[in-house]
Swiss-Prot record:
Segments carrying motif GXGXXG motif: 322-327
Taxonomic source organism: Vanderwaltozyma polyspora (strain ATCC 22028 / DSM 70294 / BCRC 21397 / CBS 2163 / NBRC 10782 / NRRL Y-8283 / UCD 57-17) (Kluyveromyces polysporus)
Keywords: Autophagy, Cytoplasm, Protein transport, Transport, Ubl conjugation pathway
Family as reported in the entry's similarity comment: Belongs to the ATG7 family.
Protein name per the record: Ubiquitin-like modifier-activating enzyme ATG7
Molecular function in Gene Ontology: Atg12 activating enzyme activity; Atg8 activating enzyme activity; identical protein binding
Subunit description: Homodimer.
Gene name per UniProt: ATG7
GO biological process assignments: autophagosome assembly; autophagy of mitochondrion; cellular response to nitrogen starvation; cytoplasm to vacuole targeting by the Cvt pathway; piecemeal microautophagy of the nucleus; protein modification by small protein conjugation
């Protein structure tokens, strides 16, 4: 055979599963963030029957080193450079990038020739549109001064012996056969004039080695300058292995030799160009929606609030009592913060006046249960939302108990819901509706957030907790009252029956209520965090009172009142001991609540003090003429 220049085929062809890009998205958001430094990738060599080269497959496990722990497969370790901007991807000097990676492989190969095999991926991930652009390179290099020519090609005798050796030594790409036909690992000192070189070959083209042979032969020649002719066995897993007799020219003896490089993968049209993929149409839309919804939240952790705990928010089970204007806006804000479990409770139905003020309803919902319609709307907005609507009459203090059996069922259902959830939002229309949930929320040690509206004012507050510091416990919605709540719903005119308020007030109160809730979750003390402490989001106020007539917001703090009708120690302890029996009487008779809490005694003392202060002097002689 005449002497000829050796031709090479591509060593690998890459294949990417959609799970790879899904995992890249997750890691970019949660781990890599703004970093565009190299991240390790792991892949296995898979023989191909139809392609001219072996395959490297990439999936969601390719970021995990355990994915190549299989002793029966040949693995390759590489890296991915994911750019933060598409401009970074486009402006990258691809030739220099490949040159740098080739030098890395060259230097690694000088220490261990088996490490001269690698791959590298450059990419840009558009996480909003779920589109990805990427390009893979397999660094092939050859010494500029080295010429490799072939003088003969023959079949390999007893090839099974060499195949078995490579199958038993999966991490080895190059080995040596000595004069006694014994196979051993390659080292620059182990080769002599009677030795032959064995190379694991991933090419499928007849008598054509993969381009990785250039890497190995360049390193071999650099370490064995005196060798000018060599017999190389290219060992494949099928029956197409072959032997080549090669001539290696002299090379420049340089400390840092120059390399000729290649290796960017061609696209399906045979052109050197990156590939792109749009996963928005290929994977489960619900999965895309779930990751997309979390996108803005996870971006907070990149720069602005790296220590914020988003998982603790997502895991909350929130009970919203009242599915009106406040309930609708609070639900939307909670959903935006990543809460996935919401239960809405209301006893009303949607009226034609509701949809313009209550964003979870529309014209066609008229007459439907508010709670159920709101929950259905949340699921339409985001199908992965676990939203439930419960139509329920919350027992109200000061209202006549007309049907004890029904009211007891309502009480038991409310108690069940409170036990099942972590946080309660009190967003009902009347004060007396909030009394029982306030009491039960304290007993069950839940986070309770309260929001209430006036015409041009609002109140947002977090309730203190019975189980907290007795001396510094924060007050609840009823701690400023000197009487127990009574029936405020009977005998009202139309303007009193409807929530008459400036439309923007509800949005302001709702958003603040949710922000207070999120801030509480950032501290392990939850209910018991004081107003003097700060979380990663800043302060956690007790009360916020806003006034739109002069556009001011007051940040207030009031301690728990020892005689509070809802959260005082006597009320909580009696409720714990007697349960429904006490509550049944308390709902019908607010004066009982005043007696138990001590409010009645306080009122008596105030009246006695007032009587003494205004005790008129009846003795005319003691009158002073003015």
């Amino acid at each position: 055979m005449n002497e000829s220049t050796v031709k090479y085929s591509t060593a690998f062809r890459s294949f990417f599963d959609t799970s790879f890009f899904q995992e890249l998205s997750r890691l970019k958001l949660e781990v890599f963030k703004l970093s565009s430094e190299a991240q390790k990738l792991y892949s296995k060599v898979e023989p191909s029957k139809s392609s001219e080269s072996s395959h490297l497959f990439f999936n969601g496990n390719s970021f995990n080193p355990d994915s190549i722990s299989d002793a029966n497969s040949t693995s390759v370790i590489g890296s991915i450079f994911n750019f933060n901007k598409i401009e970074g991807f486009k402006d990258l000097d691809k030739h220099q990038f490949l040159q740098d990676r080739a030098i890395e492989s060259w230097e690694a190969g000088l220490d261990d020739i088996n490490k001269a095999v690698s791959f590298h991926v450059i990419s840009f991930a558009d996480l909003k549109k779920y589109k990805f652009i990427y390009w893979v390179c397999f660094p092939y290099f050859q010494l500029e001064s080295l010429e490799i020519s072939c003088t003969n090609v023959t079949e390999i005798e007893n090839c099974a012996k060499y195949q078995d050796w490579f199958n038993n030594n999966r991490s080895q790409w190059v080995s040596i056969v000595d004069s006694n036909c014994e196979i051993g690992s390659y080292s620059k000192n182990a080769f002599n004039k009677n030795s032959k070189l064995l190379i694991r070959d991933t090419s499928k083209m007849k008598n054509t080695p993969s381009a990785l042979a250039k890497n190995f032969l360049s390193i071999f020649k650099y370490q064995n300058l005196e060798v000018k002719e060599i017999s190389v066995y290219f060992v494949r897993e099928d029956d197409s292995s072959f032997q080549m007799s090669l001539k290696l020219s002299s090379i420049d003896n340089e400390v840092t030799p120059k390399l000729k490089t290649s290796g960017w993968e061609k696209n399906l049209l045979g052109r050197l160009a990156p590939l792109s993929i749009d996963l928005s149409t290929l994977i489960d839309p619900l999965k895309v929606a779930g990751q997309s919804v979390d996108l803005n939240l996870k971006l907070m952790k990149w720069r602005i609030a790296p220590d914020i705990d988003l998982d603790v928010i997502k895991e909350r089970k929130v009970l919203i009592l009242g599915a009106g204007t406040l309930g609708c806006y609070v639900s939307r804000s909670l959903m935006a913060w990543g809460v996935r479990k919401l239960t809405l409770v209301d006893n009303g139905t949607v009226s034609f006046s509701n949809p313009v003020r209550q964003p979870l309803f529309e014209f066609n919902d008229e007459g439907k249960s508010k709670a159920e319609a709101a929950a259905a709307s949340l699921k339409r907005i985001f199908p992965l939302m676990d939203a439930t609507g419960v139509t329920l009459n919350i027992p109200m203090i000061g209202h006549v108990v007309s049907n004890e059996e029904n009211i007891k069922k309502d009480y038991e259902k409310l108690l069940e819901l409170i036990k099942e959830h972590d946080t309660i939002f009190l967003l009902m229309d009347s004060r007396e509706t909030r009394w029982l949930p306030t009491v039960l929320g304290n007993i069950e040690n839940k986070i309770v957030i309260n929001a209430a509206l006036g015409f041009d004012s609002y109140l947002v507050m977090r309730h203190g907790n019975y189980y907290g510091n007795a001396e510094k416990r924060l007050g609840c919605y009823f701690c400023n009252d000197v009487v127990a709540p009574t029936d405020s719903l009977s005998d009202r005119t139309l303007d009193q029956m409807c929530t008459v308020t400036r439309p923007g007030v509800a949005l302001m109160a709702s958003s603040l209520a949710v922000e207070v809730f999120v801030s509480i979750l950032q501290d392990e003390k939850r209910n018991n965090i004081s107003t003097e402490e700060k979380t990663v989001l800043g302060e956690v106020p007790h009360q916020l009172r806003g006034f739109l007539n002069n556009f001011t917001t007051l940040k207030l703090e009031t301690p728990a009142y020892e005689h509070c009708s809802a959260c005082s120690k006597p009320i909580i302890e009696v409720c714990q001991e007697q349960g429904w029996e006490f509550l049944k009487q308390a709902l019908a008779d607010p004066l009982l609540v005043e007696r138990v809490s001590g409010l009645e005694k306080v009122k008596q003392e105030v009246e006695e003090l007032a009587a003494k202060s205004f005790d008129w002097v009846s003795d005319d002689e003691e009158l002073v003429e003015l």
